Curated annotation (Swiss-Prot):
The protein's name: Large ribosomal subunit protein uL10
Keywords linked to the UniProt accession: Ribonucleoprotein, Ribosomal protein, RNA-binding, rRNA-binding
Organism: Erwinia tasmaniensis (strain DSM 17950 / CFBP 7177 / CIP 109463 / NCPPB 4357 / Et1/99)
CDD domains named in the record: Ribosomal_L10
Classification lineage: Bacteria, Pseudomonadati, Pseudomonadota, Gammaproteobacteria, Enterobacterales
HAMAP family (UniProt xref): Ribosomal_uL10
Length: 167
């Protein structure tokens, strides 16, 4: 479908605005995936706070220029589906990783997080980042465990001291 200049400018403006507020970006090749499957992916993306769009590579190069996602420029070949994580940095990576397991033709190209390019082979690094709630839960469990351990050591020291004075 031919796009006129105004349409191209509108696409660049829209995606640029989204990119400014995004925490991470993931690019993928969705050739061979059925429309039904893509619709499911888009629905899951909306629920996870992920903005997804198929954008021409020339327009996408303009979008990422001067942003933290500029490192993705070299991966922009062939049909490109870009996903921006808006709420959690690992949301798009997690979504694409799970979708790729179920759909062999779906190929994750790369991801970008804080200006760093993450290859498709290392996408697990980003996909396994804990959410805010998970991180707080882990911290609280660690703190609780440390406090319990300190109490046990203190009680053992008191016991040892009493045994030493009794003997």
């Amino acid at each position: 479908m031919a796009l006129n200049l105004q349409d191209k400018q509108a696409i660049v403006a829209e995606v640029s605005e989204v990119a400014k507020g995004a925490l991470s970006a993931v690019v993928a090749d969705s050739r061979g995936v059925t429309v039904d499957k893509m619709t499911e992916l888009r629905k899951a993306g909306r629920e996870a706070g992920v903005y997804m769009r198929v954008v021409r590579n020339t327009l996408l190069r303009r979008v990422v220029e001067g942003t933290q996602f500029e490192c993705l420029k070299d991966t922009l070949t062939g049909p490109t589906l870009i996903a921006y994580s808006m709420e959690h940095p690992g949301a798009a990576a997690r979504l694409f990783k799970e979708f790729a397991k179920a759909n062999a033709k779906f190929e994750v190209k790369a991801a970008a997080f804080e200006g760093e390019l993450i290859s498709a082979a290392q996408i697990d690094r980003l996909a396994t980042l804990p959410t805010y709630d998970e991180a707080i839960a882990r911290l609280m469990a660690t703190m609780k465990e440390a406090a319990a351990g300190k109490l046990v050591r203190t009680l053992a020291a008191v016991r040892d001291q009493k045994e030493a004075t009794a003997a």
